[in-house]
């Protein structure tokens, strides 16, 4: 994996955390000049991004790094909508209604054998899945927004919840 420029994401993360470059340097066991270089725009290697994400324990920064390095789901930010739990819940409800309006048709289509699906059927199933993805994406951002109120990152919350999910048999493992 290659190094990436992350100066803007770092600036936003330490501002959210009320932290300084020196604190980040000490917490990640990296030279102050190295950390300062990342803030100036020097590319950061993947290992450094991982260490900083772990130390910062900031959901948006972690999502930013995952997106930059692995091209996974980007963090949701909007220049139009507030990122408050209330606003995100309203948007989530709208997305849920939109998905539900497509659900019955999609569920019927999903009962067909794959070879019997027409191109139109596949488009309707894809439309349903994409609307479902909208809903999940917004719901995830809503959870992050709620967790920010109690100063907990999404990853920390997931780590806390894994034992419960295992007891419920939602996931395997010891």
Pin down the residues of each PLM region.
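Recognition helix of helix-turn-helix/homeodomain-like DNA-binding domains
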Residues: 29-44
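The alpha-helix within a helix-turn-helix
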Residues: 14, 25, 53
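DNA major-groove recognition helix of helix-turn-helix/homeodomain DNA-binding modules
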Residues: 47-63
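Short, charged recognition helix plus adjacent turn
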Residues: 65-91, 157-174
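A short, Lys/Arg-rich alpha-helix, primarily the initiator
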Residues: 1-16
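Charged, low-complexity intrinsically disordered regulatory/assembly segments
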Residues: 115-174
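Helix-turn-helix/homeodomain-like alpha-helical modules used for DNA recognition
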Residues: 71-137
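Short alpha-helical "recognition helix" segments of helix-turn-helix
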Residues: 20-26
